[in-house]
């Protein structure tokens, strides 16, 4: 889509001031801690790109507010590295650079904003190579510090801290299936057959690059949703739609983008109850 189409879709160029007004009308306010998921093209033609989006959200939350996003690691070793032919695997492992919170690029699949956010002055990125988050603002260190190596979406994760601190989640043109906070609900929920994964990634420990083994709920297929979600449908979309139907969250528009604003604690509570009520309740494992 070219610039003219994007401008026409939003009824004009999307400026920082326009974004701030729309965010404030939605209910984003001073002192908020907000995790944002963004699809830039849905907003329209944003004058200044991701930096303008970041500036606008920070304007809306003010000096006492904090902006958070999910990064991941764009160049992380693939989960199937152990299945590579031995010669290939060992050659890669011998020189694969360790994850560096300051240098390692955010996963491009998460959009442009996380990568831009991690470059902001004062940005704090969590230490987990596979599930890193980034935050800017007074709550950045409390949210990011000492991200647990194992169960990085579970208790004491940045997601758990977000919910515990009264944080919010903003889907700014991003689809409902990007609601990463629901992985925390998956980690907490007791569900028979819940699957876990173990994998290795290079990190720096004591000044040395080491391959560390991690354990986490399988964020691709950790909960056996197939019994209750039709094939081809993203489970998070169904959960989020049910959540909205239950009156949880606010819906509006920011420029051309459809937006949703959720209280993080409400998302976690609803997600856990949704999973447990449909999966049978008793804890399972793998």
Curated annotation (Swiss-Prot):
Q: What class of enzyme is it?
A: transferase
Keyword Acyltransferase applies: yes
| UniProt keyword annotations, A-Z | Acyltransferase, Antibiotic resistance, Transferase
- Can you supply a Gene Ontology BP term from the record? response to antibiotic
Q: Which domain of life is it from?
A: Bacteria
**Pfam families in alphabetical order:** Antibiotic_NAT
**Is tRNA-binding tagged as a keyword?**
no
According to its UniProt record, the EC number is 2.3.1.81
Q: Name one GO molecular function term.
A: aminoglycoside 3-N-acetyltransferase activity
Bilayer-crossing residues are none
InterPro entries tied to this protein? Amioglycoside_AcTrfase, Antibiotic_NAT-like
What catalytic reaction does the record list? a 2-deoxystreptamine antibiotic + acetyl-CoA = an N(3)-acetyl-2-deoxystreptamine antibiotic + CoA + H(+)
Q: Which family is this protein grouped under?
A: Belongs to the antibiotic N-acetyltransferase family.
Q: What function is annotated for this protein?
A: Resistance to neomycin.
**Protein name in UniProt:** Aminoglycoside N(3)-acetyltransferase VIII
Q: Which gene encodes it?
A: aacC8
